[in-house]
């Protein structure tokens, strides 16, 4: 199989208790040029233990694409404005198609 040229980007996910909060977070991070783009999906059903009790809640998942250069500032902004006491924040490096990855890693449009 032929390999596709790629560029490395970061992808991060977090969750919110309302679609409005999820959309607001993406809007804020994109407008500040900290994330290049984001998607909201949900509701999703989350199962977890909180304060010793099993919980099941509906949440909205936000997936963000951003550059290594913006990681620290994006995380600072997200943490400062996220409504949860403990935010889910999972980040991984991904290989993206060259044109898309270059766009994600570029400066403000």
Residue ranges and their predicted role:
Residues 1-109:
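Positively charged, small/polar-rich N-terminal and surface patches that mediate targeting and assembly
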């Amino acid at each position: 199989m032929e390999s596709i040229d790629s560029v490395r980007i970061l992808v991060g996910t977090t969750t919110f208790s309302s679609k409005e909060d999820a959309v607001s977070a993406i809007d804020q991070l994109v407008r500040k040029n900290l994330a290049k783009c984001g998607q909201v999906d949900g509701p999703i059903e989350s199962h977890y233990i909180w304060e010793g009790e099993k919980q099941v809640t509906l949440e909205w998942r936000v997936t963000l694409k951003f550059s290594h250069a913006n990681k620290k500032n994006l995380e600072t902004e997200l943490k400062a404005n996220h409504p949860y006491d403990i935010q889910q924040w999972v980040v991984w490096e991904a290989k993206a198609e060259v044109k898309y990855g270059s766009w994600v890693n570029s400066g403000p449009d």
